[in-house]
């Protein structure tokens, strides 16, 4: 029991480490492979790839630790944590990507993922209602992957629109979290707005440079996994990334590490489902990311589950 309490008490420390290695594996492994094949001179590219690969293993370890800690609160996460634990060994099975075992696990992740995200929502405060679009985004990404991997059909929807709606809800959640009328909140929002400036400049450069626009249309969607049905929406994607950065930075400065790290986990992996998740760890990450966000509200005095079922405790 003492060990459990210590793990829960150190959750923020594990989240910080998870966020660091998630950023490194995203920058130098997950997304680095796409610009690295272009005829560009990238200094020390081999070293960066090594950093990315090493970071990926640490990312897996800390994701597993965080998932184990959260499963103490969210019971529907327990089977998903077990799947995450065995996921590296599944790749050792010959032709595993077309095996009945993998298909069964993916369907299980879809069902349990929906249950887990709903559990995370109802066990958090009323403020978390603003995260419903993000919940939809997470589960749509998993559904799109299964639809393609198992049934060989693509889900044709405007992912960018859903992403923008998710950002709107997330920003409203971040700004409303904690004391709104406080110096820390004003500083956090100000720094968050400043973090958008590079994206605004980048959007302006792209919109006035057709060659760069074509290049970014290949790199950015490939990096995130998102599909843009209108190539001229690349500037909207850049602004969406800027708004996401603003929300994450604001959240971190306000002291809500869970919200910042959780949303980063979601946006860097959820769109990989559009073309089918290549690894189960990427399929599970958005679910865990959503629960990471809602975990900051678990101690709230007015939780949704208490309103839905007033006689229920816990």
Swiss-Prot record:
Record membrane topology: Multi-pass membrane protein
GO cellular component, one term: plasma membrane
InterPro entries linked to this entry: Cyt_b558/566_suB
Membrane spanning residue stretches: 47-67, 76-96, 102-122, 127-147, 155-175, 186-206, 233-253, 264-284
Keywords: Cell membrane, Electron transport, Membrane, Transmembrane, Transmembrane helix, Transport
Location(s), subcellular: Cell membrane
Protein name per Swiss-Prot or TrEMBL: Cytochrome b558/566 subunit B
Organism, scientific name: Saccharolobus solfataricus (strain ATCC 35092 / DSM 1617 / JCM 11322 / P2)
């Amino acid at each position: 029991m003492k060990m459990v309490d210590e793990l829960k008490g150190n959750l923020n420390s594990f989240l910080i480490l998870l966020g660091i290695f998630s950023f490194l594996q995203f920058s130098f492994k997950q997304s680095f492979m796409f610009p690295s094949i272009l005829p560009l001179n990238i200094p020390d590219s081999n070293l960066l790839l090594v950093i990315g690969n090493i970071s990926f293993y640490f990312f897996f370890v800390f994701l597993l630790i965080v998932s184990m800690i959260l499963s103490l609160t969210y019971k529907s996460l327990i089977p998903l944590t077990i799947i995450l634990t065995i996921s590296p060994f599944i790749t050792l099975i010959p032709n595993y990507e077309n095996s009945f075992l993998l298909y069964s696990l993916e369907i299980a992740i879809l069902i349990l993922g929906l249950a887990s995200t709903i559990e995370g929502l109802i066990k958090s405060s009323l403020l978390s209602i603003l995260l419903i679009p993000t919940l939809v985004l997470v589960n749509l990404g998993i559904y799109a992957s299964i639809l393609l991997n198992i049934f060989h059909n693509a889900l044709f929807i405007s992912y960018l629109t859903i992403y923008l709606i998710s950002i709107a809800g997330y920003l409203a959640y971040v700004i409303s979290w904690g004391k709104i009328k406080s110096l820390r909140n004003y500083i956090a929002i100000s720094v968050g707005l400043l973090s958008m400036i590079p994206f605004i400049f980048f959007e302006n450069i792209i919109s006035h440079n057709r060659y760069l626009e074509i290049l970014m249309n290949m790199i950015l969607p490939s990096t995130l996994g998102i599909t843009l049905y209108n190539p001229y929406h690349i500037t909207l994607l850049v602004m969406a990334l800027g708004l996401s950065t603003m929300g994450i930075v604001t959240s971190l400065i306000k002291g809500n590490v869970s919200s910042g790290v959780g949303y980063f986990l979601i946006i860097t992996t959820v769109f990989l489902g559009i073309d089918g998740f290549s690894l189960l760890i990427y399929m599970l990450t958005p679910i865990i990311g959503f629960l990471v966000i809602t975990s900051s509200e678990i101690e709230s005095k007015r939780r949704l589950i208490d309103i839905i079922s007033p006689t229920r405790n816990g």
